[in-house]
Every structure is written in C-alpha cells, then in structure tokens.
C-alpha cells in the first residue's frame, strides 16, 4: 500500500447533512477498496483563493490514507462526476523522505508529537544534559 493525502472542496450551498453524507461517501470509497484512513481533518468553510463555479467559499476536507494505486483512479473519477465537488487533489507520498513527512502530518493531525520531532528532542535533551555535566565539572575544578 502507498501513502496518500487527498483534499476536496465542496460547494458552500450544501447543508450540514449533505456535507456529512459526501464525506462519508468518500471515506467508504477508500475503505471498500481495502484502503486505510489514518486520519482526517475537517477544515470547514473557508474563502477560496479565487472564484470557482461562481462560488467564493467552499467546505474543505482532508484525509490521509494508505491504499493501492489502482483505487486512486476510481476515487478521482468519483470526485470528477460529483457536481458538489468544486476542486480536489490527491497527493502520493513515494520516497522515504516523503513518507516520513506523511507520518509527521498524520501525527500532527492526531495531535501527537511527530517521529522526527521526538528524535530532535531526544538529541537536544542529551546534548543539554552533556553540556550541564561539562559545566558542573568546570565549576568544581576552580
């Protein structure tokens, strides 16, 4: 399975029930094709950078998931035929560095410290602890 991120923007004219229904529909598309949704972000109603189909606002939703590449074509097809989707994007994370970034984004979305941040904090803590010991040795030698 590969790592993906998708974001779609729904028309602002949809009522809350319709928005929830569309979100659930796309989640089911991923899971029915053996995909695993790691996390999702409901970004809500936002201003668009530019007018799209006579709309100045849109409802943004982001999902981070793992899936087989063959499923992506179906997901994109379903985005395209749905008139309520103003825009969408699917991003594939391929390289080791990209996959690490994907994990960091998922951790941040889940409000967990990222793997890279933990490594940095451990290194920083060890460095500051080493510096404190060196400083205390210097003060004893005077």
Curated annotation (Swiss-Prot):
- Drop me one GO molecular function for this one: small ribosomal subunit rRNA binding
Q: Which CDD domains match?
A: bS6
An individual GO BP term = translation
Keywords assigned: Ribonucleoprotein, Ribosomal protein, RNA-binding, rRNA-binding
Extract the PROSITE patterns matched here.
RIBOSOMAL_S6 (PS01048)
Pfam families for this protein = Ribosomal_S6 (PF01250)
From the UniProt entry, list the residue stretches annotated as the region Disordered.
110-142
Q: Give the highest taxon in the source lineage.
A: Bacteria
Q: Which GO terms describe its cellular component?
A: cytosolic small ribosomal subunit
Q: Which family does it belong to?
A: Belongs to the bacterial ribosomal protein bS6 family.
Q: What does this protein do?
A: Binds together with bS18 to 16S ribosomal RNA.
Q: State what protein this is by name.
A: Small ribosomal subunit protein bS6
Lineage, uppermost ranks: Bacteria, Pseudomonadati, Campylobacterota, Epsilonproteobacteria, Campylobacterales
